[in-house]
């Protein structure tokens, strides 16, 4: 996106509440075994193609509530994407649990941040902000991640990033 001159506004949100509204009690990748097997194979292929370190997490999905609540206290500038990448690296490359304050603090440090967002998430909860982000995702008909919204049009899945960028160029 940066190479294409497209500005991205990161909006972390929780998928769990959106899945629950669809009647799912777990990730669809656990509920539907064939879909799950495909996901893990596809993640292996994509991360290899992109040169991203990846190992299947010991537990999936991991609880991302604390990571997401912490994200609500980070400015949407360049540090938020760095923090999100650090959280994903911890969970999907290093097999560390991003539900723990210790791991979140390390992710903040890797993004060049102090632990203030974590402290605010722990003290003030961040629940209202997190619920607002889920509501905003719901309003945009977002049902999975990653999702990209360009001028109100939804693109879902990493393989749709190119189409989303093309749409941004046209508009």
Protein language model features and the residues they cover:
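C-terminal cap of thioredoxin/glutaredoxin-like
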Residues: 1-7, 11, 86-171
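Structural alpha/beta surface segment adjacent to cysteine/selenocysteine redox centers
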Residues: 1-94
């Amino acid at each position: 996106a940066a190479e294409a001159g497209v500005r991205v506004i990161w909006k972390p949100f929780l998928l769990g509440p959106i899945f629950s509204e669809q009647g799912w009690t777990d990730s669809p990748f656990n509920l539907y075994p064939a879909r799950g097997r495909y996901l893990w194979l596809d993640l292996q292929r994509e991360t290899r193609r992109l040169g991203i370190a990846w190992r299947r997490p010991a537990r999936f999905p991991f609880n991302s509530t604390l990571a997401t609540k912490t994200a609500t206290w980070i400015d949407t500038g360049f540090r938020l994407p760095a923090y999100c990448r650090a959280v994903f690296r911890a969970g999907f490359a290093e097999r560390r649990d991003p539900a723990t304050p210790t791991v979140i603090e390390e992710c903040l440090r890797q993004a060049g941040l102090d632990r203030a967002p974590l402290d605010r998430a722990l003290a003030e909860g961040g629940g209202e902000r997190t619920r607002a982000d889920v509501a905003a995702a719901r309003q945009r008909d977002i049902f999975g991640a990653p999702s990209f919204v360009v001028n109100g049009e939804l693109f879902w899945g990493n393989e749709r990033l190119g189409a989303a960028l093309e749409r941004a160029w046209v508009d």
